[in-house]
Amino acid sequence: ASRTVPRLEMDMNRMFPGDASGDMMERITAAVVDSIIGSDICMDLHASDIFVREIPQVRLSEDFAEALLPYAKMTNADMIWMNATATVHESTLAHSLNLLGVPTLVLEMGQGHDIHRSFGNQIVDGIFHIMSEMDIWEGPESVLQEPAVSSDGEVEFIRSAVDGVFLPLIEHNHYVKKGDL
């Protein structure tokens, strides 16, 4: 799946909140927003791109972090990244819905537009927990993990400096400090 509009090569997640009187794409994004208004919560799920492998994480804009952090901690994600990247900034679905009063979390995970089943199951456990807290779900719940919470400057992507095959010296989802490798 892709959020890029075929043939137009336009990123739909940079067109929100849309305009009901605008062009075709503005009308579509406005209709999406309109269909979600009034919801108790929204979770915007993203699989990472083909060059990045990411642990399950919630990305929050600093503008809404105080209100969203309690929900984010219930998602069962490995990490909460505050003020992280463009996925939570203006013209995105999450930013627009948060401005309009719908608490919206961006969950990012996986690699190559693929969400591994274990990551999906982990987040589904969190979704059931949130539903239970909101009195929507009465079934059994899994024990949730405590996520690491980070603000800008505390998260680094590890990437190869040159073209070729990149073989990391550490496993995914480990803390690394200067001098460790």
Feature locations, PLM:
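Structured catalytic-domain cores with a bias toward divalent-metal coordination
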Residues: A1-L181
